[in-house]
């Protein structure tokens, strides 16, 4: 059987995902020491099954090291494969060197993910100069598209919506949602 863990602030989504997939939900706890280090503690996964870690990667700098330790720990505890469900996938927008000396974080982060996780599920990543995650992540990856669901929710809950995007690169998503709603948009 597959086992599912939720990183802190991802527990509610992990619970819902466990209900819909039938995966066994297990505990993952982080303890923060006064010096800023973090201890990861987790229940053992079902042997020979996938271990799935749910962690949205907004504000990634504080999340990535504990996530790396959780993935390594669950593998050491017997998981056959380790997968990541990341509703938001960080570090994708820096996908080229815009100025001399800048890191191409999309490639670096994709490489780290490839060393750490056997598969990945994410929602509409910031792929501007890459056509697929396969260009930067070497394992199976599933991209979930949510424009129709988002438009459906907005249509039910918002009167006369205006769809707003934070920057020019968000236009690809903003325009689809606005078109589905027949609503104006601004980027």
What are these model-predicted stretches?
Residues 1-187:
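PRPP-associated nucleotide enzymes
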């Amino acid at each position: 059987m597959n086992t599912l863990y939720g990183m802190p602030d991802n527990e509610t989504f992990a619970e819902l995902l466990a209900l819909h997939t039938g995966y066994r939900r297990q505990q993952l706890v982080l303890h923060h020491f006064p010096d800023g280090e973090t201890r990861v503690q987790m229940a053992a996964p079902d042997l020979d099954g996938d271990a799935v870690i749910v962690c949205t990667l907004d504000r990634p700098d504080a999340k990535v090291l504990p996530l790396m330790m959780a993935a390594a720990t669950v593998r050491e505890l017997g998981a056959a494969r380790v997968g990541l469900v990341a509703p938001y996938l960080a570090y994708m927008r820096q996908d080229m060197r815009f100025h001399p000396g800048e890191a191409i974080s999309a490639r670096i982060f994709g490489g780290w993910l490839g060393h750490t996780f056997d598969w990945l599920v994410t929602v509409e990543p910031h792929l501007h100069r890459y056509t697929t995650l396969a260009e930067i992540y070497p394992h199976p990856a599933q991209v979930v598209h949510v424009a129709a669901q988002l438009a459906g929710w907005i249509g039910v809950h918002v009167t006369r919506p205006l769809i707003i995007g934070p920057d020019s690169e968000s236009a690809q998503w903003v325009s689809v949602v606005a078109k589905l709603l027949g609503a104006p948009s601004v980027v």
